[in-house]
Amino acid sequence: MGVMLQRCDSLKILNISNFDTSNVTNMGYIFGSCYNLETIYLGSFSTKSAIYIYNMFRLCSSLKTIYVNNDFEIMEDTDSTYMFLDAKNIVGGNGTTYNNSYTNATYARIDTEETPGYFTQQQE
């Protein structure tokens, strides 16, 4: 699944809420360099089996919103190097903005007052 949508320059909104990714191990660069992508709906998208999510949203320079549900979870040993590198317009659901110090999976969570993140809660 890695690089599946890389460089899809014509995409602005992507809804893959119903993709079954429960057994996918490589998600590296999956959305990388999608320069015009602004919104992604991930819904039931699962990264629990993922070993590689590096560069997942790298160079998504127009990306503002990533919607996920409460089940989105990244395992501790997953390689998330540069997951959000240069996704400079991203804003979490509680207003957290891109910070170059957090380009790995540290902020790959729903943005709340207590826990800053780059994701927005997707309504069911």
Over which residues does each language-model region extend?
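A recurrent domain-boundary module in secreted/ectodomain proteins
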Residues: 108-124
